[in-house]
């Protein structure tokens, strides 16, 4: 079962509606027991990093998510959900993330208009099952003021450009993160 983590942060219903429309079996979950039954996990998120991390910690699902990640269950973080996978974020001070993908979440340079809002291309850097049936340079919708900066360039699957190139798709083992809204 594909589960969408409901930790009261994110546009869960748009994601669920998109999966339903595509006939992809899915379920919104908000308990550790339901997380433990997952075959694949979607971790959405919108808003600020620190409150999202606090909500995830307070949800009671963090230990179950950690167990699933350690046993190889595929997990896709979306927008702030992708940012939470990193070690830390500099949004409103320095805040610890999940630390599942080494790296930081950085603010776009001040001379850029933020948030970046609109359609942007993703340039695929290497082949990956995530890109199956997705054309290189395809446009996706972005709304963000911070970007992923993985410590290891091997974790970068896709780049986008907004003033400069930034990682818009990352992967480490069974973890994927996308900065855009699919």
Model-found features: residue ranges?
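An anion/phosphate-binding loop that grips the pyrophosphate of nucleotide cofactors and donors
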Residues: 38
């Amino acid at each position: 079962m594909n589960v969408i983590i409901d930790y009261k942060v994110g546009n869960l219903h748009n994601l669920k509606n998109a999966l339903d429309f595509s006939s992809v079996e899915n379920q919104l979950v908000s308990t550790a027991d339901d997380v433990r039954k997952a075959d694949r996990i979607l971790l959405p998120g919108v808003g600020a990093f620190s409150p999202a991390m606090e909500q995830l910690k307070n949800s009671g699902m963090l230990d179950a998510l950690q167990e699933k990640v350690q046993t190889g269950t595929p997990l896709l973080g979306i927008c702030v959900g992708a940012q939470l996978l990193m070690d830390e974020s500099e949004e409103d001070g320095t805040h610890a993330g999940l630390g599942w993908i080494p790296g930081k979440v950085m603010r776009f340079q001040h001379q850029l208009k933020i948030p970046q809002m609109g359609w942007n291309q993703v340039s695929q850097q290497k082949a990956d099952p995530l890109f199956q049936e997705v054309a290189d340079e395809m446009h996706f919708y972005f709304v963000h003021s911070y970007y992923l900066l993985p410590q290891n360039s091997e974790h970068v699957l896709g780049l986008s450009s907004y003033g400069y190139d930034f990682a818009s798709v990352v992967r480490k083992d069974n973890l994927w993160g996308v900065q855009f809204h699919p």
